């Protein structure tokens, strides 16, 4: 099982806060929004994670998360050259996913509960997708 965190978009509705970086790095309770996504995946024993980056501040995302080791995960960065939607971003992960099941997080969404049961039901289930 692998994880994908979408970290794209321009964050225009949050300007001027997003003039210099992505909205997913804006802090909520002293940590970036997308860190909650990463921690949810790790808590569910998903440690192979791709972060889709693109637009302003991609380098800041890479600087903050690095290779993922300080969070106990392995990170792969995948560039999305222009915002073409969620389906396009996920399609860029084809090689990373390598026919495994995967969970997608939008980097600016915070789920304040464990995803472990959801993940286990998906892994054990005989279906292609779960929402």
Question: How would you describe each model-predicted region?
Answer:
Residues 19-24:
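Short alpha-helical oligomerization interface
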């Amino acid at each position: 099982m692998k994880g994908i965190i979408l970290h794209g978009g321009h964050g225009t509705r949050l300007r001027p806060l997003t003039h210099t970086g992505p909205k997913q790095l804006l802090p909520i309770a002293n940590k970036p929004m997308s860190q909650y996504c990463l921690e949810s995946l790790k808590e569910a024993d998903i440690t192979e994670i791709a972060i889709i980056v693109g637009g302003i501040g991609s380098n800041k995302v890479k600087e903050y998360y690095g290779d993922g080791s300080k969070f106990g995960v392995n990170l792969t960065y995948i560039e999305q050259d222009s915002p073409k939607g969620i389906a396009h971003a996920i399609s860029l992960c084809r090689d990373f996913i390598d026919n495994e099941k995967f969970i997608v997080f939008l980097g600016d969404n915070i789920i304040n509960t464990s995803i472990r049961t959801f993940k286990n039901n998906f892994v054990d289930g005989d279906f292609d997708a779960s929402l």
